Amino acid sequence: MGSASRGPRAILLLTLVLGFLIAPLTAEAQRPAKVWRIGLFHVGLDHVPPSLDGLREGLKALGYEDGKNIRLDWRNLLDEDAAQVTAREWVRDGVDLIVAFEPQTVRAAKAATSQVPIVFLHVDDPVTDGFVASFARPGGNLTGFAGRPTLRDKQLEIFKELVPGLRRLLVLRDPTDPATVRMSAVVQEAAATLKLHLVEREVTTAADIERVFGALKPGEVDGVFLISPRLEMNYLSLILRLASERHLPLPGPLKLWVTRGALFYYGVNYPALGGAAAQYVDKILKGAKPADLPVEYPRRFELILNRNTARAFGLTIPPSLLLQADEVMR
C-alpha cells in the first residue's frame, strides 16, 4: 500500500515541478517582442536626405520591419531650432536611438542627450565639429559616417573641365555654419591651382541670396559654387532658380540637384551610405556602444552628369568624363 500510494503522489509532485519550470518559459513566449523606437530627422523642407531610402532598405534587409519590430519616426524640419525641439521630445519620450542626417540635427541631438545612441550621416568632419573625440574611438554616445571635405577640390576640377571658359566663380558661404571656414580653405587652395578667381559672398537667409544674385552684373561671374552645407540643405530650390535665371551653371551637392537642373554631381553614393548606417543601427540595437564603433568614411562615390543642362549652356561633355560617369541624365 505504501509504495502504491507513493506513485500518485510522485506523479503529482512531478507535475507541479514541471509546471513551475514551464510557466516562466510560457510567459516569456507570450511576452510581446521588443519594438525599437528610432527617431530620424533632417533640416531642409524641399528635399529628403538621399541616404534615407538606403537606410530603410538596409534595415529591412537586416530583418527590421517598420510597424512590427521597429518604429521609425521620420521628421523633415524647417531649421535647427525645430530640430532642437524634436530632439528634446524624443529623449523625453524614450526613443531607443536617433539618426541625424546633417550637422544641424547632430548638434540638436547631442545637446539633447548624452545617453541615447546617435548615428550621424552627412557630416564632413565630426572631430573638428566636436561631435566625437576621434574617428577610431568616438567616445560618448555618437558615431556614424563622415564626409570628405576634400571632395570640393575634385568638384572644382570637374567643373573646370566641363566649363572650359570658367574664370570667375560666385562662391556662396554662410559665416554661421561651422563647416564654412574649413571648406573655404579647401576651395581657395583648389581655385588657386585651377587659376579661378573666387567672388565670395556671405549669405545666411533667402533674402541674402536674392540680394547677391540681384546685384550681379552681366558677365561678372561664369558659374556658382557653394561651400556651406547649411546653404545646400536649406536653399536648394531657390539657388537653382536664381542660377538658372542668370544662365549660370553650378554643380549639385546632391544627386537631386542634378535631376532639377544642376550641371553635375560628384560625391558620396548616398544610398550605399544609408545601407552602411543601417548596419551601425543594427549593431547598436544588439548591444554595441557608439563609443566603440569607429567613425567611417563613405566607400563609394559617383559622378552624375546632366547632358540636357550641358547643352543648354552650349557645353560639350568631354569623352573622359563620360567614361567616368556613373549616370548621364538626358
Predicted regions mapped to residue ranges:
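Short hydrophobic alpha-helices and adjacent helix-cap/hinge residues
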Residues: 1-330
